Swiss-Prot record:
Source organism of this protein record: Variola virus (isolate Human/India/Ind3/1967) (VARV)
Virion surface side: 25-47
Keywords: Late protein, Membrane, Transmembrane, Transmembrane helix, Viral envelope protein, Virion
Name of the coding gene: OPG081
Protein name according to UniProt: Protein OPG081
GO cellular component, one term: viral envelope
Membrane-topology annotation of the record: Multi-pass membrane protein
Function (record text): Envelope protein.
Length: 79
């Protein structure tokens, strides 16, 4: 059972990390000058970037805390 929990934890951390990277990239793209990039040329792309920006804003701090807590827990389990 411990192996299943470890695998699910690793999958969860990976998904959270990927979502944080995508959302962070969306925040960077959103903050750039719209005249210099292609963001405003596509309404669907702009909408997707906006959605990922809000997801990034809402999960950045809790996600970082969860990743840190999981890392500390794994260090304590090894000891």
């Amino acid at each position: 059972m411990a192996d299943a929990i470890t695998v699910l934890t690793a999958i969860g951390i990976t998904v959270l990390m990927l979502l944080m990277v995508i959302s962070g990239t969306a925040m960077i793209v959103k903050e750039l000058n719209p005249n210099d990039i292609f963001t405003m040329q596509s309404l669907k792309f702009n909408r997707a970037v906006t959605i990922f920006k809000y997801i990034g804003l809402f999960i950045y701090i809790p996600g970082t805390i969860i990743l840190y807590a999981t890392y500390i827990k794994s260090l304590l389990m090894k000891s």
